[in-house]
Amino acid sequence: MKNKRNMRLRIFFNLLIFIILLFIGGHANAQKGLHINEVFSRYGNSKGCTMVEMNDIDIRGHRINVFKTLTYKRYAEEIAGIVEADRKQAKKIREVIHDGKVQSGCLMMPPTRKGHNRFVVFTNPINGTGAVIYIEGKVTVDDIMKICYKRNCKKRQIT
């Protein structure tokens, strides 16, 4: 009787560990196949950088599976090189150019096996601070532009 109980407990715990590893593994490999993964792994814990990761969230009415962001004050050249490597694989590219230089952009990367769209959004350093965002979910380029670039501007009347 004790052996049966121990066997059931062992099977239960093994199954539980397997399920947990499946869930964690899906988010841990979110950027699999993208160069941007290197930015988060290399600079995520560096001095002058702030990294935030959120999973399965709603942002402005859009369901996001993975939202990962890194702001940095250093490493601009290194990070720009890594973003450029992903730019070459991008399916769609939207950029904001000012005075002939790319200020920010949104790269639509190839989707995941589950059909989730993947995006790399970036801003090049202005006053020394830049940002890189990885977004994964059933959202479109237009949704990402609304999420990341929506400005809270009030109309002013000029008299």
Give the predicted meaning of each segment:
Residues 1-36:
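Bacterial Sec-dependent N-terminal signal peptides
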Residues 30-90:
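N-terminal secretory signal peptides
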Residues 36-43, 72-73, 110, 149-159:
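Terminal interaction module
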Residues 56, 101-107, 145-146, 155-159:
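Low-complexity, flexible helical/coil segments
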Residues 61-67, 102-104, 116-119, 128-130:
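Short, surface-exposed beta-edge/turn micro-motifs
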Residues 72-117:
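Mid-chain, structured segments of secreted extracytoplasmic proteins
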Residues 108-141:
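A short, solvent-exposed beta-edge/loop patch
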Residues 129-159:
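C-terminal partner/receptor-binding element of secreted or periplasmic proteins
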